[in-house]
Amino acid sequence: MFMILIINNHGQYNHRIHRTLRYLQIPSELVPNTTPLDEIISRDPEGLILGGGPSLERSGNCVEYIQKLEIPILGICLGHQLIAKAYGGEVATAEAESYAQIELEILDEDDIFRGLGPRMSVWASHKDEVKKLPDEFDVLATSSICEVEAMKHHDKPVYGIQFHPEVHHTREGHRVFENFYDVCRS
């Protein structure tokens, strides 16, 4: 059965990701970030969403999932930062913490931003951000407060987004999930 696993990184919006996917009728399950890799593999998911969370230190097995799974991955907020770190990028405290509505400038509408550009109103809720993009990644979107709002691996279906598509403040956020679902099905 088709399934996307959502990794719960203890963030305030992780349950909203699951609720949004259920609303979109995308089969999914929310699992703890301490779930062993072999259990994740045994569930045979078609995709993985790494939810947000309070800190890199509480990210459980996420880096192992990123490095060893060969399936589409979407990292949101902390998940985005974990992808960057797993591939050699750098994460540090943002110049200004952001808990606000911001305007995203979409640089590449490919894949997860298909049909959403060139601008999108989104909700930002973070104190850390990707400061150095990993070598194998391209920037997909930027904003006035964060240079790497979204990124994509050159060759793999691995994406990271700093903002929160699962909250109602992000207009058209559900379409990011629909587009990721399409990536998982292709």
Curated annotation (Swiss-Prot):
CDD domains: GATase1_GMP_Synthase (cd01742). Signal peptide: none annotated. Residues 3-186 form the Glutamine amidotransferase type-1 domain. GO terms for molecular function: ATP binding; GMP synthase activity. Pathway: Purine metabolism; GMP biosynthesis; GMP from XMP (L-Gln route): step 1/1. Its EC number is 6.3.5.2. Pfam families: GATase (PF00117). InterPro entries: Class_I_gatase-like, GATASE, GMP_synth_GATase, GMP_synthase_A. The keyword ATP-binding applies. Keywords: ATP-binding, Glutamine amidotransferase, GMP biosynthesis, Ligase, Nucleotide-binding, Purine biosynthesis. It is an enzyme of class 6 (ligase). The keyword Glycoprotein does not apply. One of its GO terms (cellular component) is cytosol. The active site is at C77, H164, E166. Catalyzes the synthesis of GMP from XMP. Heterodimer composed of a glutamine amidotransferase subunit (A) and a GMP-binding subunit (B). PANTHER family: GMP SYNTHASE [GLUTAMINE-HYDROLYZING], GMP SYNTHASE-RELATED. This is GMP synthase [glutamine-hydrolyzing] subunit A. It comes from Methanothermobacter thermautotrophicus (strain ATCC 29096 / DSM 1053 / JCM 10044 / NBRC 100330 / Delta H).
